[in-house]
């Protein structure tokens, strides 16, 4: 088999890893809709889904069947090409961003030297998806929702990036594996970069448009915002894309601030690395759901004021202090 060169083997393994990670993330995003409803029911002293299968475990299958058989309707007054393109970008950009997440020491799709920058590039594409959805729907509520979402996402992505610059300054690299290795050799970044962690988790909730930062799709004000004209699988792609965003931000929180796959007993039980990563990611996913269950939605102007009046000073102070400490250590 002379044709099976080392380069070809590397390509095949990368493709297989990408497919496995892609399917796992999509399945996790879909399952999260059931998990969220069960947890919300538990915290609100009610049952949640409990009719389809034991503990409502087959509710996801019922929802998928319903979604598949709904009419894939495109409004006659919409820009059909852009209307169809928007959910593809919304879901696809977040799936591609998962390529830079190192799940275990040996498992990950891409080991990029610009890993964090690649994440910001893919996250920035979701703004286009929201804008395309609102503009192409030719609906005033959809347009208002997309304008809200664009302003909110662009604002909070600034602080999402600034909150990680302290980590980059300490490690001296944008590579995700280098960041995890630095935490293994020294200390998890939740301690020296606590203010960066606080800003990142707030901005992460905002850019995923999760409650209490779900003003772009506020049902009471905008009748579901930029989703309003979508139905069937197009709406389903937006829906699953939102949960994929939650999984992505949770995985980044675990990787950047809590050591990723790092934990005790890895020398004797290396398979625990995946368990540690999954447990840390699952904790932050539950935190996202708990935030939705416990906090009220503020006004839109309060959300934007909070970003520039609270998050901006916090991230700048964190970055300046980190820079000063790095320079002092280098002397």
From Swiss-Prot:
GO BP terms: aerobic respiration
Superkingdom of origin organism: Bacteria
GO MF annotations in UniProt: oxidoreductase activity, acting on NAD(P)H, quinone or similar compound as acceptor; quinone binding
Reaction catalyzed: a quinone + NADH + 5 H(+)(in) = a quinol + NAD(+) + 4 H(+)(out)
InterPro entries: NADH_UbQ_OxRdtase_su1/FPO, NADH_UbQ_OxRdtase_su1_CS
Keyword annotations: Cell inner membrane, Cell membrane, Membrane, NAD, Quinone, Translocase, Transmembrane, Transmembrane helix, Ubiquinone
TM regions (residue ranges): 7-27, 81-101, 114-134, 154-174, 187-207, 238-258, 271-291, 310-330
Stretch forming the signal peptide: none
Subcellular location: Cell inner membrane
Major localisation: membrane
Coiled coil regions in record: none
One GO CC term on file: respiratory chain complex I
Membrane topology: Multi-pass membrane protein
Enzyme nomenclature, EC number: 7.1.1.-
Enzyme class: translocase
Pfam families: NADHdh
Family: Belongs to the complex I subunit 1 family.
Subunit structure as annotated in this protein's UniProt entry: NDH-1 is composed of 13 different subunits. Subunits NuoA, H, J, K, L, M, N constitute the membrane sector of the complex.
NCBIfam families in the record: PRK06076.1-1, PRK06076.1-2
Known function: NDH-1 shuttles electrons from NADH, via FMN and iron-sulfur (Fe-S) centers, to quinones in the respiratory chain. The immediate electron acceptor for the enzyme in this species is believed to be ubiquinone. Couples the redox reaction to proton translocation (for every two electrons transferred, four hydrogen ions are translocated across the cytoplasmic membrane), and thus conserves the redox energy in a proton gradient. This subunit may bind ubiquinone.
Protein name: NADH-quinone oxidoreductase subunit H
Organism (species): Pseudomonas aeruginosa (strain ATCC 15692 / DSM 22644 / CIP 104116 / JCM 14847 / LMG 12228 / 1C / PRS 101 / PAO1)
UniProt lineage: Bacteria, Pseudomonadati, Pseudomonadota, Gammaproteobacteria, Pseudomonadales
